[in-house]
Amino acid sequence: LLFLLSDINWRTELSSNLTKTNTVLENRKPIFIDSTAQGTANLDTNSFLKAGVTYAFIVIVSSNISSESYEQEIACALNNVNMGNNGNYYKLVSTFTGKCSKGDKLHITSYKNGGTWTLFATRAIFIPVS
């Protein structure tokens, strides 16, 4: 009988440990968010991040306008605080990085002095760090 109780406790403990491990692994998966909205992208982390986890993020914006005669600028803000700008060319790849958590808001904006967008694509990658 003691052997059977010991066996049951071992299985219960193993099951509990596996559940905890699965939760930890699930919380370590990177999250990819893509947007093809032209000229702007609003990323509300309430929609996709997990509470209680801090994330490192990278936002990459690829943008082209229709002619070399024009210029553009891309900006990224976290909770209305500007994190950086990139611009003065008709073709750009802009990269912004930082840390955030659920509830934070990322806002990508652009300015162009003419032409039309031939490409505007945003990819954000959120990597759990704690």
Where on the chain are the PLM-derived regions?
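Long, low-complexity or tandemly repetitive, helically biased scaffold regions used
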Residues: 1-9
